């Protein structure tokens, strides 16, 4: 055994606590050497162990008769969608790497989540991304956003995976700490699903396949488990470097090997690289592994065991083939011009043994390293932040209603030009949404809808979270995020199926931060339970703060849904003149936390929109029932920017005109009526002959029917109550130009 014994000081420098260092010594029965310390520091980092979140995550609902892989069991969640098929999906973050190297940070985030999907045997169909950045008027923020989007586009386009949607949210709190959350969804036959395990097959060979191993990404897991600071800029070596063309080859070779039944198990080498893949596969299979690092294909000379075990070089997998299938495995990877090299074997003693230069460099029980095994778990102290009470004292009468008279039109145009409302075309045009010929409803709308090849089914996808809402009310804001994601799925005609989450929060050791995290988990869990949606997995990203302060809490919800008959899709916007428009649900507008309040009055304050989870479930049932009768011409979630923005987008996306009267929605303030944001509300279009039928069905579900207007051929939006009469061209200018300058060459 290598004898370079380490000290407590070394352990502290690696991000471990005094107590954790003591626990490691108890596990090993001795003081660890440097390689072992590096392995423990990576595997027990927040990024890999979820040590400060796992106890809270276990309170989320994770059961469903459709689940094929529960949260934490595999690389991603999997759910049965009938006909022998499963949908496999997950969302993950690459926040800190993007902050210091936006192109590679964002690109490798896409690559990592793709591998999580095809490692399970599923072919990726679509991807989404949820982005949070600071004000792009500032040069640094503009650089970060534009480079991150290019990284996402270049990597995804090279792989040939369509982008079905996503979101962008801009606020000053993300200036030093942007968020990049990447989601991928794939489909696989039940009998072709793969697992990240040794399968208990003692004596089987262990292969490393794919790219060579270099020094890029060393300490990546630890880097993601610390606050960003001025020194973070120097940590570029902790950012991985991706090669999408290599990933494409790796995907095809891996899927071929899985489909031919050659493998016992396969695991992506993401965070903590070989350390993570060997320990997780071994622990799941209740075995150990003996690894010879001299056999690993290196791209750099002189790498030692510490570096080899912690390298996060991209596009690599660890594979355990079935006995007798080794040569066939190698042939497949050689056909795709990829490495497939035996580096060890599965052992019976449960130990991870690492050799290099003929010497034993590390010997650690696999179970002691992994989440759910020996990795530490903590419940941190909580304290309710005082600001949560302060913001609720705000009342709308503290601001003037600036929409009176002819100002309504001017205010509407300002909101349409805001970063959080304006057109996403400068972003979505960098992504290939047509590849694979699966697009039915593409990016830029409420939810994406994609055909599932070889079936009549369609896959609905959405990501959602209003970070201002979760800042103002963590519990209700998280509930709102789940409900809005579900709404954006069912307005396509699809039934919401399951949830993956990306939990982006600040330092968990600060009691106020941990309180906010805990409340968001509670709100998310309650909403998912009531809506009958299992949480299939996801990612926790703590330490999202800089010396200037923490980000807004952002529990991003990734939602998938299934439409059994893709011919029954619902478009976001009507396509004909003479279509009646109405809001269904319970219109309860609020200016608290609204885009109007921030853009026009420069405030983030107040109570967020009231939400009744029972009504949300009934609205979902209503929309799906109406769609079964094929009487809806369109359906659009009513939320950010309020009814005025929803009507404006209807004109912009349909090219039609609208004559509207908002009497049925009228509140005591015009700005509240026009720009107040509401939960439990969907703007629908329908034939006039169906009006009374829809009204009766809506009331039968205990909801309200608010008639507001009709489409025409004028290309003009007219809102009589607000003295708004504005043409398509007038709307289009500010809406289309909002982000153009950010991405101008």
Swiss-Prot record:
Subcellular compartments: Cytoplasm
Catalytic residues as annotated in Swiss-Prot or TrEMBL: 47, 94 (proton acceptor)
Pathway assigned in UniProt: Purine metabolism; IMP biosynthesis via de novo pathway; 5-amino-1-(5-phospho-D-ribosyl)imidazole from N(2)-formyl-N(1)-(5-phospho-D-ribosyl)glycinamide: step 1/2
Gene Ontology biological process: 'de novo' IMP biosynthetic process
Entry keyword set: ATP-binding, Cytoplasm, Ligase, Magnesium, Metal-binding, Nucleotide-binding, Purine biosynthesis
EC number: 6.3.5.3
InterPro entries tied to this protein: PRibForGlyAmidine_synth_PurL, PurL_linker, PurM-like_C_dom, PurM-like_C_sf, PurM-like_N, PurM-like_N_sf
Record-given protein name: Phosphoribosylformylglycinamidine synthase subunit PurL
